[in-house]
């Protein structure tokens, strides 16, 4: 199972608790705006918007902010920006692969901020295609365990196209092809299982084990990248053992 997923879960829990909360809110709001602009402002007919709103609600974004973002994206209210998705590729400490997904209204600013964060934290930019081939676009649904077993989840989602269910400690992660994401999410809902988020994400096709020191350096790089308002998501191919995760949790 992907150490990056366990890491991402830990990072999300920390983000909700600390000063990064405001930045997290801003990124979720941007997702809603883009989803509404791309597929229309009605969540019932726009699964991407539905899922963007669900994730924002689960992260405690105020309903007023969610509704205003939906209206801006749908053109019902003025003020929506022309957000563009831009992908950057690079290498982190010890040659770890890094894929950076930006959502920006200023390509030059985004490129500059990504480059500065990389070079100041032991990373380097890479040519397009030199890193992205190490990742696959997947549908990812995360849900809190509560009293569920892995078999409970698997039974609910198997026929909907789920490929695997990963145990991430306090949560489960259901992986599918992006085209099966909505079916998997709906299968969970029909089984009466609540979920935290459902979104398309990049998953490493092969993960690289790293020691604690390298993990700390990669963590520092990812944090620096995510500090940019233009950066939505950062993906790496690190594989963190339980021992390394435990050491990181103590930091």
Curated annotation (Swiss-Prot):
Q: Where is this region: Disordered?
A: 1-20
- GO MF annotation, one: DNA binding
Task: Please tell me where this protein is predominantly located.
Answer: cytoplasm
Would the keyword Translocase turn up in this protein's UniProt record? no
Q: Which family does it belong to?
A: Belongs to the TACO1 family.
Q: What name does UniProt use for this protein?
A: Probable transcriptional regulatory protein MAB_2888c
The UniProt entry's GO biological process terms, in alphabetical order, are: regulation of DNA-templated transcription
* Keywords, in A-Z order: Cytoplasm, DNA-binding, Transcription, Transcription regulation
- Kindly list the places in or outside the cell where this protein is found, as annotated in its UniProt entry: Cytoplasm
> Which InterPro entries does the record cross-reference, listed alphabetically?
Integrase-like_N (IPR017856), TACO1_YebC-like_2nd/3rd_dom (IPR048300), TACO1_YebC_N (IPR049083), Transcrip_reg_TACO1-like (IPR002876), Transcrip_reg_TACO1-like_dom3 (IPR026564), YebC-like (IPR029072)
GO CC annotations on file: cytosol
Superkingdom field: Bacteria
């Amino acid at each position: 199972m992907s150490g990056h997923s366990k890491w991402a879960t830990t990072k999300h829990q920390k983000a909700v608790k600390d000063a990064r909360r405001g930045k997290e809110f801003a990124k979720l709001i941007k997702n809603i705006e883009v989803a509404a602009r791309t597929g229309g402002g009605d969540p019932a007919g726009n699964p991407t918007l539905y899922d963007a709103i669900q994730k924002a609600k689960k992260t405690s974004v105020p309903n007023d902010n969610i509704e205003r973002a939906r209206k801006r994206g749908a053109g019902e209210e003025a003020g929506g920006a022309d957000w563009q998705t831009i992908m950057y590729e690079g290498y982190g400490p010890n040659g770890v692969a890094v894929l950076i997904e930006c959502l920006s209204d200023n390509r030059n600013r985004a490129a500059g901020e990504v480059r500065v964060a990389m070079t100041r934290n032991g990373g380097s930019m890479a040519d397009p295609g030199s890193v992205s081939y190490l990742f696959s676009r997947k549908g990812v649904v995360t849900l809190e365990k509560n009293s569920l077993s892995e078999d409970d989840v698997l039974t609910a989602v198997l026929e909907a196209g789920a490929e695997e269910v990963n145990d991430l400690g306090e949560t489960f992660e259901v992986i599918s092809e992006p085209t099966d994401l909505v079916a998997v999410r709906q299968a969970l809902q029909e089984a009466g299982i609540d979920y935290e988020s459902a979104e398309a994400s990049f998953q490493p096709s092969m993960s690289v084990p790293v020691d604690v020191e390298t993990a700390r350096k990669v963590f520092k790089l990812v944090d620096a990248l995510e500090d940019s308002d233009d950066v939505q998501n950062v993906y790496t191919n690190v594989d963190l053992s339980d021992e390394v995760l435990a050491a990181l949790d103590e930091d």
